[in-house]
Structure formats: structure tokens, C-alpha cells
Curated annotation (Swiss-Prot):
Annotated protein name in UniProt: Fanconi anemia group D2 protein
Effect of K400E: Reduces ubiquitination on FANCD2 and reduces stalling of the FANCI-FANCD2 complex at DNA junctions
Top-level taxonomic group: Eukaryota
Record note on modification: Monoubiquitinated on Lys-563 during S phase and upon genotoxic stress. Deubiquitinated by USP1 as cells enter G2/M, or once DNA repair is completed. Monoubiquitination prevents DNA release from the FANCI-FANCD2 complex. FANCD2 is only ubiquitinated in the FANCI-FANCD2 complex and the monoubiquitination of FANCD2 is promoted by phosphorylation of FANCI.
Family matches, as InterPro entries: FANCD2
Location relative to the cell: Nucleus
Effect of R407E: Reduces ubiquitination on FANCD2 and reduces stalling of the FANCI-FANCD2 complex at DNA junctions
A single cellular component GO annotation: nucleoplasm
Family as reported in the entry's similarity comment: Belongs to the Fanconi anemia protein FANCD2 family.
Record keywords, A-Z: Isopeptide bond, Nucleus, Ubl conjugation
Lineage: Eukaryota, Metazoa, Chordata, Craniata, Vertebrata
Glycyl lysine isopeptide (Lys-Gly) (interchain with G-Cter in ubiquitin) cross-link, renumbered residues: K563
Species this protein is from: Gallus gallus (Chicken)
Length: 1439
């Protein structure tokens, strides 16, 4: 141990002489150091200048494992060593010797390591050290001595290359890192520039690990003045490679950079986001988010959204699914490791985002805004959905905003369900943390009135159940049960649908929570028949899929069903039948699957069969006395056979089938005879016989006698008799449906046994009712109506039954039956018009009875929007503009309450029976989807028959226009009901929801995809019919939009026009289906597009990419524009093209859409009678079409200016009932529509002009000023139109959108004017002067509204005046900012009316108040009071 005694001056001199002697013999010293090793106690035996000076200064060098020791304070050591060196006789040469000694000493790696590691305080026995517990390393201490620093720095940098090729850890130490660490936090660095320069040079040649160490140490080495320069170099390095991303960003985040450089570096980081390694991605994102400023947060987040693609993170996750296929267990283990790593990286990524969102308010709001600003459907990603969920769960303040944005995106189709499925399936580890938010949002979405939002909420439930743990699954089930028990129709239906999907996809999982589902049985009174069917399907599937576990559910179901069947309440009996038949379906399924009944014990199957037989007997006994209940039983059994086609036990079929085969002929069929015995209200006549050549064994449907027997008095007589079963015509169609499905099931689809029923006649009466109805009594008219309803429903079921038969003769008979239906509908329409208050017999029995008495109105719609009646046009005498505007104040917006079909039905011509019978749809039997296979038949119009008289039409029966219109109308109703559009209308009010499934019972048992597949198969015949329509209208409309009425058959024209309308609507309903956005339906979409594209390129479309198929389909449909017969057809064609072009919308399609919409707007739409098309629905379509034109045109401001500067003046100069010659759709009646759209689109377009920035170049400023100049000019033109068109709706539009425009100007234009005023003073002054004129007119409107005390208008006034006042002060602030207050002057702004006349009551009071109160000011804007009450000069113009 070396003694710690202090050296005297003599000792110091002796040491110096020794040092001097040693310095003269360097060779000897080096050989000693290199050859001689330390003794066992760890000291050095032979000392040189280096060792001696260190020892005398207080450092004891150690070799081996021991660290160097320091006996004095660090600063004392440095001072002693510096003094010793400076006073050494050979100074400054001694410095070189000292460095040489250091160099020799650190050749040994263990000694070098000791010099790089912190020294330890030297301790002596029995004494306490005064040295601090932590001491720097020897090298660090030497670097703190200025005379040694340059040489030590050079020595250390030269040592680094020695370790280039060392594997870290070879010697147990990372030497490069230790070396670089010595340069950190040096207080007295002599040449910082040189050190950093050498380090950067070293960086360029070093291996990656050493580069990593150097970069991460730079922030602690650099001086403040060097940070920006080095940051630029690091930014360049960041762009060159991806291996140093993490250390570079780590270093940059610790540097104090100026704003410009920070933006540049952040942009560099942004560019590498798409290609950076997954494990480095969290670091990159953290750097970007933590260095974002409030001013550019939205821009940065928007760029980040575009760059960050989670699909690259999914690729490793896909290995999880394929790992089972790997033969090697080692490979499988490796795959699992990769998947885990990938999931952890994604988790870290969202943890980074979560931290930024939680602690940086700007980031949270900017992310929401960035998602909100994204408009294209293709721009939205899984990332957006996850971030919205993250913000919703993290920031309580942003929850409402987040929910609003998510709702909006779902409604617009930007957040398809496929996107959500990807999020749940690929990132479940991340999303599980947001489960409370997911549950909350799903519950909220189910309350929505928008089908797309409701569907999204239900999908959230399904995905959460599928991918989360048991706790989450239980919460999902409890939430769904709560929805069902809430009594809300929408929630109830959707929740049951979700549970149905879950029981199909995850029966074993749902069975765990069957106890919760079973509690719904306690709330059965709230369920309608369709909902009961769904519930019992769910419970039956759970009860019978695994017999032992589900036995307790079976007992409860039996108990409830028996209770209902025994009830005397018809509604309860109805519920019991539906429950019983649904349960039968689950019991009677063939057990041939691996988990089916073949593996079960025989006695269990016998027990179930016994239960089933007992249940069947009970149901049959309870039904036989009530026709409606018996008809329901027949329908439910028929639905069961159809749904489980081929899977039902044959014994069950035989049990009720044999009696059915016997009962139907006995009850409803009689032998055909010339006369019928009995007394009836009308003489019996056999009609519609298609088998007149078959006289022997002919049969007929005994309809009229049965209808006579079913009258109330006769039914009572029958009930008093001892008959067990009542025969009613109500049961005719349901019983036949069950018979034909039973027969088809037993005979592999063949209906040969009952084909006589297709052509057999009906016992009706003479149906030539023209002119006879007025002479009939009410009872006779109602009897006749009932007879026609029964006949129509019989024919509809016959068509359902035989439409798929391949025999040519039977096909012909089916087409004839369709003709019979259209003929009977004409007769029925006339009868119903003469029989007000008549309620038809029921035709559907599994839905609640429609409320109220249906009515028929051949001249117009049954109901108006919001259920309100239209006021009489003659109520007041006022201007044409005011009258029409008041009528259409609500009609100029797209109608959200009526469906497309309801809207079209209200405007159809009086001659179309379909328009008359719309309100009676619930009283007709439902057509099956298979009926539409008849559309494959060709179209034969009367005009073709007239020109080909030699052709006998009886030889080939083809589909006529009336039959085509009938089929298309029904198909469109079905499609609209089941295919939810991506951007959808609102659901009708909840009070109407109870009847929404009436007439769609069979359809609702099919999934939307099944319906879509069916329609895609029909696209070829639909295209054929469309082309026939196109050819027809090209001949009758030789000039664009002008009907050639010479020799025109008006009725045929109307029918063909209706067919065209329905065809286009069918295309729109199909291609707007939201399901096409889901990945699993992509092949179906391709098949649909391929059919359309094949019409232009036959045989060339099979291998075309999707984008080309879309383009060809778009072009095919675009070709129909020349033959469009009505504005409604034009509107729907535009919607079809929109639906197709959005997948995706490209530049040339936008141009075509704008051109097409403008063409329709510039076309004169006339009816065949010569009247101009008009009405609220015309206005609604016009609103949408005008929006399409302005949204897709290249220059929206120019388009608005053209309409307002060309079209409107033409209208003003035209006659009272005239229109614009350039835009014939612009008339005094439609002006409010044009005005609203132009104002809304103008306000929307200026919001897209970026706000002015100080950094904008002069050219950019000028371009923005030009845009604002045009916008303000358009605004001025539109506002001044109020002087001519002063109706209340126009004023309301002005006040609303005027305020929004001024607010947008304040937010976006004023910053631009601040920075461009000096450079472009004249332009700014001109802009403000023009705007001043507009805002002055707005002020006049405020006065006008107050004078007339119109509450609808005055509600807008306070907010508008506030905006105008803000504008005044904002202009003053701009002038002050530019030191140019004299550029404008202010004056008194007087209150005037719309025509500019001063309001007298205020004019007389003005002189008195002028001196006492503050005056309203008029700068570049309008009305604002000076808060300080100062007077201003009268006037108000800018200089």
C-alpha cells in the first residue's frame, strides 16, 4: 500500500530529478512498462514520468481487476498534475513524454479499461477519505487539463479504429462506447469544433455499433452553437440509411433546434416512416409527435397518417395462421417468436401515440381533425379507427368529438365494416385495452337512426365477442340482452341479429352465457313475431346443439310455448306457434355431422321425437278453429322447409305432409263445371283457365264460394256446427305454399304432382266493372275487393311455385299468370278507388297488423314528408318566388324520410296501377327472389307487335312492359329493404319501425349477401332490358329531352319510363350496397362489374384488373345518358355512376360526372303531355344533382359564377313561368334550390383555401388572393339576388350561409391579408370593398328580419351580427399590424330594408342618439358598435 503522506519540497525536487532522468531514457522506460508486469498487490514496480506524475498528483494506477485509485479530490488532482507539468524542467517536452507514457500504459486492454472506468477513492486503515464517493475516470480527468487535452483527444480517437472489428463483449467491455463517453460534459473543451469534426469523420467510417455510440453521445458533447450544424448532418444521415434511425432520432430529440431546422428534421423522419423497421417505428413516431407544434400539428399528423401503414405490421401476424402447417417444431417456434415480436412492436407504437394523445392536447385534437379532413374513402385506414378508439378511451374531453367524427365517417362509408374487422383481427392486443370504449360506442351506435351506424355498432359487438377474453364476451352478451329487453325496436332487432350471428359462428362459446340469453324469455311481451322467431332460433340452437348442456333451456322453452299455445289471446297463440315451429326445426334437423345425433344415445333421440310429436299435436289442435292462426302455422312450416331444404327429417315431413296432401284438394279445389250451386252476391264465373283444351278431369279453385262462406255471419254458423276445422280463403295461399314446398322436398324439386294448379281456373265473377261500381252496394264493393285480393295472392303464390320449372309450356303459363296479375291489379285499383275505408283480408301473418286504414289516391302521394299535409296553393296571394319557395322550403334538401321508391311512387302517372297500390303492399303475398328469373325472358312491346303483324304472339309468350314494371318494382322494394347503402338515408321514425318487415318475411330470412348474389346473376337480363329501353327512347325522343308525340302511345311511354326508372334504381341499390366494401365480397363486386364491362368488350373482361372493370362499367352506364326520359331517371343514373366511380374516384371520372350533371341541369325536362317536371321530389333530385356538379367540377368558383351571372339574369328577364335558357332547370320555383346549393358550396369551397402564412411566397399569396377575390365576388352577386328573390327561404339561406362565409373569411383570409397588405395593397383594398357591399346587405337583412318579427329569421341575427362585429375589429387589427390605420375610415351605418331604403322609425331617432350613444361602424364590413361610444363620420367607404 502506498503511503498517503504529503510530499515536502525536498521530496518534490527529488521526484522531479528522477522524472527528468527518466525522461532522458524513454526506451528504457517503455521496455520496462511493456515487459514488466505489476506485482501481486496491483501496483507498478518501475515508474516512468507518466506513472510518477500521476502518483505524486494523487492517482494510484492499478493493473488486473482492480480500478485505479484516487487519493485526493478530483479538482486537486487536476491542479497538482497541471502544476507539476508546467513546472517540470523539461516543459513543454514533458507533456509529450507524459502522453507517450499514457499511450504505452493503455496498450494493455485491461489497463486501458481501468483508465476509462471511474476511479475509486483510496482508503487507508483507520482513516476516512475526503474524496467524493464518485470519481471520474483517469482519462476524463486528464481531458480536463488544458495542456493535455488535445493530445489525449487525439490519442483516444486513434484508439477507436482498433475496435472496429471486435464483437462487443469479446473482452467483456464495449471500448468504443467507453471512449466516446469520455468526451461527454467536458467543461473546458479547447477546440470543440475540431473534436466534433473528427467525431463526424469517425462516424462516416465506423461500423454501425460504434456509429450508434457516437451519435447517442453527441448531445452531451456538442456546444450550443454546434447543435444546428450537426443536426443537419444527422438529418442527411437519416435519409441515407435505416440502420441508425433510432440513435439519430434519440440524439436529435435531445438537441435544441430552431423551428425551421426542427421542421426539416421532422420531415426527414417522416420520409422514412413507410420503410423503417417495425421495431424502430415507435421511436420514429415518438420523435415526430413529441416535436410537433400547435401551429402545424394538423399538417404533421395528416402527413403521418398517410405514411404510417399498419398493413406492414400485419404480415408477420399472418405467420400465426400458417405455423400449424410447418412440419418442424423449431420453425413453428421461430414463427411464434416473430409474431410475438411484431405484436409487441405494434403495442409499443400505440403506447407512444397514447402518451402523446394523453399529454399533448394539440396532438389529440390534430389527429381528430386530420381524420375529419380526409374525404376520400380509400384514404381511411385501420390506423384511423384504432386512434379514434384510443382517443375516446384516453381523453374524456374529446369523447363527444371523437364519437361525432366516427359517426360521420361511418355514414359516409369511409369506415367500412371490413376495416373494423381488420383492426380487431390483426390488432386485438392493442384494441383490447379500449374495450370499455368499444362497448360504450357499440351501445350508442345501436341507438342511431342511420342503418350504417347501427350495422357498425353490431359488428363491433360481434368482433369483440370473437377476439376478446371471457370477461369481455360476458359483457358483450349482457349488453345485447339489455338492448333486447329495452323495448326499443331498432336495438331489439339488431341485438337479436347479432346474437343469431354469434350462435351460428360461435355456438360453443355462446353456450357458456346461455343463462343470460334465456332471461329474454321474461320480456317476450315486447317482441313482435319476427323477433320471437329469431329468439327461439337462438335458444333452440343452444338447447339442441349439445343436448346435455342445453337441457335446462329446453325445459324452459317447452313451458313457455305450452303456456302461449293454451292462451285465448290471439297474439299469445301466434307467439306460441312461431316458437314451436322454430324449435321443431332445431329438433328435426338430420344428425349426420360429426357432432350430430348419430353419436348420441338412441333413447335420447326417441325422447326428442316424442316431445316433437306431442308439440305438433298441440299446435294442430290450437290452430284448427282460427283461420289466421292456422295460416300462420302453414307459413311457419313452409318457411322451415324452405330454410332447411334437404336437412329436415323425412319422418317430420310425413307427419304433417300426408294430411296436407289430403286437406288441400278437399278444402279448396273442386271439379270444373259450367254451373255452381248456391246463392252468392255475384254470379260465379270460371276465369283465367290456361288448360281449356283439357276438358276431362278439369279442376278449379273454389274461390268465390269460399269467400262467401267466410263472411262474418256465415262463419258464426259454421262455428256452431261440429266441424273441427274451419275452411277459409285466408288459408288458401299459405296452404298452397306449404303444399308445393312439401311436394318439392319429397320429389327433389319436381312439382309434377300439383302442376295442374298452375293452369286451372278460379271461380270468380265477371270483372268488367267499368261504369258498374257506382251501382253496387258497399258490401258488394268490399266483397269484390276481397275476391280480387284473394285471386291476386293465389296467382302470386302460383308464380312463386312454378317460376323455376324448366318445361317450356310451364314457363309460358307463368308468364301468362304474370299478365293476369297486372290485369287484376288494374281492376283492383278501380275497385279500391270506389271503396273508401275498406280493409283487405290479411296476407301475412307473422307481422303485426298495419296501423290505420290504407287509402288509394290516384292523383298523388299518400303521405307527405314528416306526415304534414301540403297547404293549399291558393291560400295567399303573393309573388311567384315567395309562394314556391315557401312550399319547397323543406323540399330543397334531399328527402331523408321517404325512400327512393316512395318518392318515385308519389310522382308516377295516374295510369300506373303500381303507384295506386303502394299503400296496400302489406296485403299481398310476398314474391320470392326466384321469381325474378322470369326476367331472362325477352321484352315484347305493343309497337313491335304492330309492325310485325305476321308474327303470332300466342306462339311465343314474352314479358310485356306491364309485367316487367311489376317485377322490377317488387325487386327494387326488396333491394332497398335489405341492401343497406354505404352512404345511407335515415331510418324512418321509431313509431313506424314495427311494420318495416311487413311483406318481407321470406326476404328477411336471407342474408344481404345472398340477395346481392341473386341480383348479380340477374345483371345480364337487366342489361338487356336497359338496352331495350335505351333503344325505345332513342326513337321516341329524337331531340334531346323533347318527346316526339306524333303517334306516341302515352300509356306505353309511361310504362316504359317506369321500367327505365326501376332498372336504374335496381342498379343503384345494388352498386351502392355497403357490403361491397368488405373484403369477402370483393369477388362478387368483380363479377357484377364484369357483366357490365362485358357489354362493351365481350369475352375480354375475365382477366382485367378491377380498376379497368370499373372504368368499362362506368363507360357502359354513361352511354345511357342520351335516352334518359325523365329527371328522376337522370338523377338515379347519376347516383349509379357515383356508386361505381367511388371505387375509387379518379380524375377523368370526376370530369365525366361534372359534365353529365351539367348536361342534365342544362336540359329541359318535359312530360309527354307538355308540362314541365316539377314538385318537391323534383327539387330534391335537383338539389343532389347540382351538388354533384359543383363538387366534381374543376373550378367550383367559376361554375358558381357562371350560374349566378348567366343563368339567374336570364331567369329574371324571362316570363313569370319561364326559366333560364342556359339552365332550363332553373326556374322561379327551383331558384331556392339553386341558391341554397350555391351558397353552401361557396362556403365549403373557401374553407379549402389554405390560411395565409408568414412563410408564403409572393406568388402563393397572390394566388390565394385571387381565389378569395373570385369567392367574394360570387358572394356579392349571390347576396344581392335577395333584392329580387326576397322569399323567406332565400333570406334564411342568406343569413345562415352569410355568417358561415364571414367566419371562414375571418379564420382563413384575414391572416393572408395581414401578411400581403403591404405587397398587394390595391388587391386587398378591392377585396375588402367588395365584401363591404355584401356585409352591408346582410345588415339590411337583419333589420328586415326584426321588422317582420319572423322567428325563423331572427334566430340567425345574433350570431350573424357577432360575426360582422368581429370582422370590423379584425380589419382594424390588420391595419394596426401593418401600421396603416388610414387605409380605411369608418362611419355611421344606418338600418335599411332589403331595397336599401332607410328604416324611418330609426332614421328619426338617429340625430338624437348620435351624440349620446356609440354609432355603428362600416369599415370593410358592416354593422358593429364601437364599445367606447365614439362618434364617427357619416359615410362608409374605403379610401
Amino acid at each position: 500500500m502506498v503511503s498517503k503522506r504529503k510530499l515536502s519540497k525536498i521530496d518534490a525536487a527529488e521526484e522531479s530529478s528522477k522524472t527528468d532522468l527518466q525522461s532522458r531514457c524513454p526506451e528504457t522506460k517503455r521496455s520496462r512498462i511493456s515487459d514488466k508486469r505489476a506485482p501481486s498487490q496491483g501496483g507498478l514496480e518501475n515508474e516512468g514520468v507518466f506513472e510518477e506524475l500521476l502518483r505524486t498528483s494523487g492517482i494510484i494506477l492499478k493493473v488486473g481487476e482492480g480500478q485505479n485509485e484516487i487519493a485526493v479530490d478530483q479538482t486537486a488532482f487536476q491542479k497538482k498534475l497541471r502544476v507539476a507539468l508546467e513546472k517540470h524542467p523539461s516543459y513543454p517536452g514533458v507533456v509529450n513524454e507524459f502522453i507517450s507514457g499514457l499511450e504505452s500504459h493503455i496498450k494493455d486492454r485491461s489497463q486501458f479499461k481501468n483508465c476509462l472506468l471511474p476511479c475509486t477513492p483510496a482508503r487507508t486503515e483507520g482513516s476516512r477519505t475526503l474524496v467524493h464517493s464518485y470519481c471520474e475516470s483517469l482519462i476524463k480527468l486528464l481531458l480536463g487539463i488544458k495542456i493535455l487535452q488535445p493530445a489525449v483527444v487525439t490519442l483516444l480517437l486513434e484508439k477507436i479504429p482498433e475496435f472496429f472489428f471486435d464483437v462487443v463483449g469479446t473482452f467483456g467491455t464495449n471500448f468504443p462506447r467507453l471512449i466516446v463517453n469520455q468526451f461527454k460534459w467536458l467543461d473546458g473543451l479547447l477546440d470543440s469544433q475540431d473534436l466534433v469534426k473528427k467525431l463526424m469523420q469517425m462516424l462516416s467510417v465506423s461500423p454501425v455499433p460504434i456509429q450508434h455510440d457516437i451519435i447517442t453521445s453527441l448531445p452531451e458533447i456538442l456546444e450550443d452553437s454546434q447543435q444546428n450544424e450537426v443536426a443537419r448532418e444527422l438529418s442527411c444521415l437519416l435519409k441515407q440509411g435505416r440502420r441508425l434511425t433510432v440513435p439519430i432520432l434519440d440524439a436529435l430529440s435531445r438537441l435544441d433546434l430552431d423551428a425551421e431546422l426542427l421542421a426539416e428534421v421532422r420531415q426527414s423522419a417522416m420520409t422514412i416512416v413507410p420503410s423503417v423497421k417495425l421495431e424502430d417505428l415507435p421511436v420514429v413516431i415518438k420523435f415526430i409527435l413529441h416535436n410537433v407544434k400547435a401551429a402545424d400539428a394538423v399538417e404533421v399528423i395528416s402527413d403521418l397518417r398517410k405514411s404510417l401503414d399498419l398493413s406492414s405490421c400485419v404480415l408477420p401476424l399472418q405467420l400465426l395462421g400458417s405455423q400449424r402447417k410447418l412440419k418442424s417444431q423449431a420453425q413453428a417456434s421461430s414463427s411464434m417468436s416473430q409474431v410475438t415480436t411484431s405484436q409487441n412492436c405494434v403495442k409499443l407504437l400505440f403506447d407512444v401515440i397514447k402518451q402523446a394523445v394523453r399529454f399533448q392536447k394539440d396532438v389529440s385534437e390534430a389527429w381528430i381533425k386530420a381524420i375529419e379532413n380526409s374525404t376520400s374513402v380509400s384514404d381511411h385506414k385501420v390506423l384511423d379507427l384504432i386512434v379514434l378508439l384510443l382517443i375516446h378511451s384516453t381523453n374524456s374531453k374529446n369523447r363527444k368529438q371523437t364519437e361525432k367524427v366516427l359517426r360521420s365517417k361511418i355514414r359516409l362509408g369511409c369506415m367500412p365494416e371490413q376495416l373494423m374487422q381488420n383492426a380487431f383481427q390483426n390488432h386485438s392486443m392493442v384494441i383490447k385495452d379500449f374495450f370499455p370504449s368499444i362497448l360504450s360506442l357499440a351501445q350508442t351506435f345501436l341507438h342511431s337512426a342511420h342503418p350504417a351506424v347501427v350495422s357498425f355498432g353490431s359488428c363491433m359487438y360481434k368482433q369483440a365477442f370473437a377476439v376478446f377474453d371471457s370477461y369481455c364476451q360476458q359483457e358483450v352478451v349482457c349488453a345485447l340482452v339489455t338492448h333486447v329487453c329495452s323495448g326499443n325496436e331498432t336495438e331489439l332487432d339488431i341485438s337479436l341479429d347479432v346474437l343469431t350471428d354469434l350462435v351460428i359462428l360461435h355456438p360453443s362459446l355462446l353456450l357458456r352465457y346461455a343463462t343470460f340469453v334465456k332471461t329474454i324469455l321474461d320480456s317476450m311481451q315486447k317482441l313482435n313475431p319476427c323477433q320471437i322467431r329469431k329468439l327461439f332460433y337462438i335458444l333452440s340452437t343452444l338447447a339442441f346443439s349439445q343436448r346435455q348442456e342445453g337441457s335446462y333451456i329446453q325445459d324452459d322453452m317447452h313451458m313457455v310455448i305450452r303456456k302461449w299455445l293454451s292462451s285465448s289471446v290471439p297474439n299469445h297463440k301466434q307467439m306460441g306457434i312461431i316458437g314451436a315451429v322454430t324449435m321443431m326445426g332445431s329438433v328435426a334437423l338430420k344428425r349426420n355431422e360429426a357432432d350430430g345425433g348419430l353419436l348420441e344415445r338412441p333413447e335420447l333421440s326417441i325422447e326428442c321425437d316424442g316431445q316433437l310429436s306431442t308439440l305438433l299435436d298441440l299446435v294442430g289442435f290450437c290452430c284448427e278453429q282460427t283461420p289466421e292462426v292456422l295460416a300462420l302455422y302453414y307459413d311457419e312450416l313452409a318457411n322451415l322447409i324452405e330454410k332447411q331444404k334437404g336437412n329436415l327429417d323425412l319422418q317430420l315431413l310425413d307427419k304433417f305432409g300426408k294430411s296436407l296432401v289430403e286437406d288441400f284438394p278437399n278444402d279448396f279445389v273442386v271439379d270444373l263445371s259450367p254451373t255452381v250451386d248456391g246463392s252468392f252476391l255475384f254470379p260465379v264465373k270460371s276465369l283465367y283457365n290456361l288448360d281449356e283444351d283439357e276438358t276431362q278431369g278439369a279442376i278449379a279453385i273454389n274461390l268465390l264460394p269460399l269467400v262467401s262462406q267466410s263472411e262474418p255471419g256465415r262463419v258464426a254458423d259454421e262455428m256452431s256446427n261440429s266441424r273441427k276445422r274451419v275452411v277459409s280463403p285466408i288459408c288458401l295461399s299459405p296452404c298452397f305454399r306449404l303444399l308445393r314446398l312439401y311436394t318439392g322436398e319429397q320429389n327433389n324439386g319436381s312439382l309434377e304432382e300439383i302442376d295442374a294448379l298452375l293452369g286451372c281456373p278460379l271461380y270468380l265473377t265477371d270483372l268488367e266493372v267499368e261504369g258498374k261500381l257506382d251501382s253496387l252496394s258497399k258490401q258488394e264493393r268490399e266483397f269484390l275487393c276481397s275476391l280480387l285480393f284473394y285471386a291476386l295472392n293465389w296467382f302470386r303464390e302460383v308464380v312463386n311455385a312454378f317460376c323455376q320449372q324448366q318445361d317450356a309450356e310451364m314457363k309460358g303459363k307463368v308468364l301468362t299468370r304474370l299478365q293476369n296479375i297486372t290485369e287484376l291489379q288494374n281492376v283492383l285499383g278501380k275497385c279500391l278507388a270506389a271503396t273508401p275505408g275498406y280493409v283487405p283480408p290479411p296476407a301475412t301473418f307473422d307481422s303485426e297488423a298495419p296501423e290505420g286504414v290504407p287509402s288509394i289516391n290516384a292523383g298523388g302521394p299518400v303521405r307527405k314528408k314528416n306526415g304534414k299535409k301540403r297547404k293549399s296553393d291558393s291560400s295567399k296571394a303573393c309573388s311567384a318566388e315567395r309562394t314556391q319557395a315557401d312550399e319547397s322550403s323543406d323540399g330543397n334538401q334531399p328527402d331523408t324520410e321517404l325512400s327512393e321508391l316512395e318518392k318515385s311512387a308519389t310522382e308516377k302517372e295516374t295510369g300506373n296501377p303500381l303507384a295506386q297500390l303502394q299503400s296496400y303492399r302489406p296485403y299481398f303475398r310476398e314474391l320470392d327472389l326466384e321469381v325474378f328469373s322470369v326476367l331472362h325472358c325477352g321484352l315484347l312491346t305493343k309497337s313491335i307487335l304492330d309492325t310485325e303483324m305476321h308474327t303470332e304472339a300466342s306462339e311465343v309468350v314474352q314479358l310485356g312492359p306491364a309485367e316487367l314494371c311489376f317485377l322490377l318494382d317488387d325487386m327494387c322494394w326488396k333491394l332497398e329493404h335489405v341492401l343497406t347503402p354505404g352512404s345511407t338515408r335515415r331510418v324512418p321514425f321509431l313509431k313506424e319501425r314495427g311494420n318495416k318487415d311487413v311483406g318481407f318475411s321470406h326476404l328477411c330470412q336471407r342474408s344481404p349477401k345472398e340477395v346481392a348474389v341473386c341480383v348479380v346473376k340477374l345483371l345480364k337480363p337487366l342489361c338487356n332490358h336497359m338496352e331495350n329501353m335505351h333503344n325505345y327512347f332513342q326513337t321516341v325522343i329524337p331531340n334531346q329531352g323533347v318527346v316526339d308525340e306524333s303517334g306516341l302511345n302515352i300509356q306505353e311511354y309511361q310504362l316504359m319510363s317506369s321500367c327505365y326508372h326501376q332498372l336504374l334504381l335496381a342498379f343503384r341499390l345494388l352498386f351502392a350496397w355497403s357490403g361491397f366494401s368488405q373484403h369477402e365480397n370483393s369477388n362478387l363486386l368483380r363479377s357484377a362489374l364484369q357483366v357490365l364491362a362485358d357489354r362493351l368488350k365481350p369475352g375480354e373482361t375475365e382477366f382485367l384488373p378491377l380498376e379497368e372493370l370499373i372504368s368499362e362499367s362506368f363507360q357502359y352506364l354513361l352511354n345511357f345518358q342520351a335516352s334518359i326520359p325523365s329527371f328522376q331517371c337522370a338523377f338515379i343514373l347519376t347516383q349509379v355512376l357515383m356508386a361505381i366511380s367511388e371505387k375509387p374516384m379518379t380524375g377523368w371520372k370526376r370530369e365525366k360526372m361534372a359534365s353529365l350533371a351539367k348536361q342534365f341541369l342544362c336540359q329541359s325536362w318535359m312530360k309527354p303531355g307538355g308540362d314541365r317536371e316539377k314538385g318537391s321530389h323534383f327539387n330534391s333530385a335537383l338539389h343532389t344533382l347540382l351538388c354533384v356538379y359543383l363538387e366534381h367540377t374543376d373550378n367550383i368558383l367559376k361554375a358558381i359564377e357562371e350560374i349566378s351571372s348567366v343563368g339567374v339574369p336570364e331567369l329574371i328577364n324571362s316570363a313569370k313561368d319561364g326559366c333560364s335558357s342556359t339552365y332550363p332547370t332553373l326556374s322561379r320555383q327551383t331558384f331556392p334550390v339553386f341558391f341554397r346549393v350555391m351558397m353552401a358550396q361557396l362556403e365549403s369551397s373557401v374553407k379549402s383555401i389554405p390560411a395565409g402564412k408568414p412563410s408564403d411566397s409572393g406568388e402563393v399569396q397572390l394566388e390565394k388572393l385571387l381565389k378569395w377575390n373570385i369567392a367574394v365576388r360570387n358572394f356579392h352577386i349571390l347576396i344581392n339576388l335577395v333584392k329580387v328573390f326576397d322569399s323567406r327561404p332565400v333570406l334564411s339561406i342568406c343569413l345562415k350561409y352569410g355568417r358561415l362565409f364571414v367566419e371562414a373569411f375571418l379564420k382563413l383570409a384575414m391572416p393572408l391579408l395581414d401578411h400581403s397588405f403591404k405587397k398587394h395593397r390595391d388587391d386587398v383594398q378591392s377585396l375588402l370593398k367588395t365584401l363591404q357591399l355584401s356585409t352591408r346587405q346582410l345588415h339590411h337583412m337583419c333589420g328586415h328580419s326584426k321588422i317582420h318579427q319572423d322567428l325563423g329569421l331572427t334566430n340567425h341575427v345574433p350570431l350573424l351580427k357577432k360575426s360582422l362585429e368581429q370582422f370590423v375589429y379584425r380589419v382594424k387589427a390588420m391595419l394596426a399590424f401593418n401600421h396603416c390605420q388610414e387605409a380605411f375610415w369608418v362611419g355611421v351605418l344606418k338600418n335599411r330594408d332589403l331595397q336599401g331604403e332607410e328604416i324611418l322609425s330609426q332614421a328619426s331617432a338617429a340625430p338624437e342618439e348620435d351624440s349620446a350613444e356609440g354609432s355603428e361602424e362600416d369599415t370593410a364590413d358592416s354593422a358593429a358598435e364601437e364599445p367606447d361610444g365614439t362618434d364617427s363620420d357619416s359615410g362608409g367607404a374605403g379610401r
